[in-house]
C-alpha cells in the first residue's frame, strides 16, 4: 500500500509589517516588501492594488520593459512606456554618435559576420539532443584548452588588507566577496607595475604630476574608492551610463 499524502500544515498569517514599510508580503522571502509605501496607500508603487478594487484584489501585472528588461512596467502602460523609455532615448543618442559601430566588440570574427544573436539562438533551439551534447563537449574541450594557459592570481596588498580590516565594523552596502575581488584587482595592478605601493603615490608626485584613474563601467564606485583610500589617488573619473543606488561618495 502506498503512503498517504502528507498533510500540509496550514500557513500562518504574515506578521504585521514594520512601520514605514510596504504591506505587500513576499512569501518566498518570508518578509514584507522593503520599499516605502506611497503617501496615499499602504503599498509601494510596485505592489499597488488596482484602484478600482479593494486591497485584497489581485495586483496589477508588472512586465519587463522590452527596451531594457532590467526594469519593469505595468502591463497596461507598456505601449506608452516604450515610446518614452529613457533607456530608449539613451540608446538612440549613442547610435547617433560618429564613433558608434554596433556590435564592433561582439567578437564576430570571420565566421560570424552578419549573424544576429536572435538567429544564433534560433539555430541552437533547432539542434537535436545528440547535436546539442556534441556542441557541449566541443565547448568543454575549448574551455579546457584555454584554461590550461590561465592561472589564478589572488593578491592583496598590505594597504588593501588594512583597509578591509577597518571596514569590518561598518555597515557597507556590498558583499565581502566583492571587496576581496576588488582588493585582488588592485594587488595585481601593483604587481604589474601599474600602481606604486600604498602611500608612495602622494609623497613622490606633486600636484601637477599626480596620477589619475579613469574607470569605465564604474557601477557604484567601490573599486575606485579603495584606490583613493589606499593609494592616496585624488584625481578619479568615474564613467557609468546606468543610475545606481547606494553610490559611494569619494
From Swiss-Prot:
Q: Which GO terms describe its molecular function?
A: tRNA 2'-O-methyltransferase activity; tRNA methyltransferase activity; zinc ion binding
**Compositionally biased region (Pro residues):** 11-20
Stated EC number for the protein is 2.1.1.225
Please state the residue ranges covered by CHHC U11-48K-type zinc fingers: 62-89
List compositional bias (Basic residues) regions by residue number.
1-10
Q: Does the keyword tRNA processing apply?
A: yes
Q: Where is this region: Disordered?
A: 1-20
Location(s), subcellular: Nucleus; Cytoplasm
Q: SUPFAM superfamilies recorded for this chain? A: S-adenosyl-L-methionine-dependent methyltransferases
InterPro entries in UniProt:
Methyltransferase_TRM13, SAM-dependent_MTases_sf, Trm13, TRM13/UPF0224_CHHC_Znf_dom, Znf_CCCH-type_TRM13
List the GO biological process terms.
response to salt stress; tRNA methylation
Ordered alphabetically, the record's keywords are: Cytoplasm, Metal-binding, Methyltransferase, Nucleus, S-adenosyl-L-methionine, Stress response, Transferase, tRNA processing, Zinc, Zinc-finger
Q: Which residues are listed for Zn(2+) binding in this entry?
A: 65, 71, 81, 85
| Reaction catalysed by this enzyme | cytidine(4) in tRNA(Pro) + S-adenosyl-L-methionine = 2'-O-methylcytidine(4) in tRNA(Pro) + S-adenosyl-L-homocysteine + H(+); cytidine(4) in tRNA(Gly)(GCC) + S-adenosyl-L-methionine = 2'-O-methylcytidine(4) in tRNA(Gly)(GCC) + S-adenosyl-L-homocysteine + H(+); adenosine(4) in tRNA(His) + S-adenosyl-L-methionine = 2'-O-methyladenosine(4) in tRNA(His) + S-adenosyl-L-homocysteine + H(+)
Give the UniProt entry's GO cellular component terms: cytoplasm; nucleus
Induction summary: Induced by salt stress and abscisic acid treatment.
Query: Which function does this protein serve?
Result: tRNA methylase that catalyzes 2'-O-methyladenosine (Am) nucleoside formation on tRNA(Gly)(GCC) in vitro. May 2'-O-methylate cytidine(4) in tRNA(Pro) and tRNA(Gly)(GCC), and adenosine(4) in tRNA(His). Involved in salt stress tolerance.
The family annotation for this protein states: Belongs to the methyltransferase TRM13 family.
PANTHER family, A to Z: TRNA:M(4)X MODIFICATION ENZYME TRM13 HOMOLOG
Anything else of interest in the record? Seedlings subjected to salt stress and abscisic acid (ABA) treatment exhibit a dramatic increase of 2'-O-methyladenosine (Am) nucleoside. Plants over-expressing TRM13 show improved salt stress tolerance, and plant silencing TRM13 display decreased stress tolerance.
Name of protein: tRNA:m(4)X modification enzyme TRM13
Give the species this sequence originates from.
Oryza sativa subsp. japonica (Rice)
**Phylogenetic lineage:** Eukaryota, Viridiplantae, Streptophyta, Embryophyta, Tracheophyta
Amino acid at each position: 500500500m502506498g503512503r498517504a499524502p502528507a498533510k500540509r500544515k496550514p500557513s500562518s498569517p504574515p506578521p504585521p509589517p514594520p512601520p514605514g514599510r510596504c504591506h505587500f508580503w513576499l512569501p518566498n522571502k518570508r518578509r514584507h516588501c522593503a520599499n516605502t509605501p506611497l503617501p496615499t496607500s499602504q503599498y509601494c508603487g510596485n505592489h499597488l492594488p488596482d484602484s478600482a478594487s479593494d486591497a485584497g484584489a489581485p495586483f496589477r501585472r508588472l512586465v519587463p520593459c522590452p527596451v531594457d528588461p532590467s526594469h519593469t512596467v505595468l502591463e497596461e502602460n507598456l505601449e506608452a512606456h516604450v515610446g518614452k523609455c529613457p533607456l530608449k532615448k539613451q540608446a538612440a543618442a549613442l547610435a547617433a554618435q560618429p564613433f558608434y559601430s554596433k556590435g564592433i566588440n561582439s567578437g564576430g570574427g570571420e565566421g560570424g559576420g552578419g549573424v544576429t544573436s536572435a538567429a544564433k539562438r534560433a539555430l541552437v533551439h533547432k539542434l537535436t539532443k545528440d547535436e546539442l551534447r556534441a556542441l557541449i563537449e566541443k565547448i568543454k574541450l575549448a574551455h579546457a584548452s584555454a584554461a590550461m594557459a590561465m592561472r589564478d592570481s589572488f593578491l592583496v596588498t598590505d594597504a588593501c588588507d588594512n583597509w578591509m580590516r577597518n571596514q569590518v565594523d561598518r555597515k557597507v552596502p556590498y558583499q565581502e566577496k566583492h571587496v576581496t575581488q576588488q582588493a585582488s584587482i588592485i594587488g595585481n595592478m601593483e604587481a604589474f607595475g601599474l600602481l606604486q605601493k600604498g602611500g608612495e603615490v602622494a609623497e613622490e608626485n606633486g600636484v601637477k604630476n599626480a596620477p589619475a584613474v579613469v574607470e569605465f563601467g564604474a557601477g557604484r564606485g567601490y573599486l575606485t574608492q579603495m584606490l583613493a583610500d589606499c593609494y592616496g589617488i585624488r584625481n578619479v573619473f568615474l564613467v557609468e551610463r546606468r543610475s545606481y543606488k547606494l553610490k559611494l561618495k569619494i
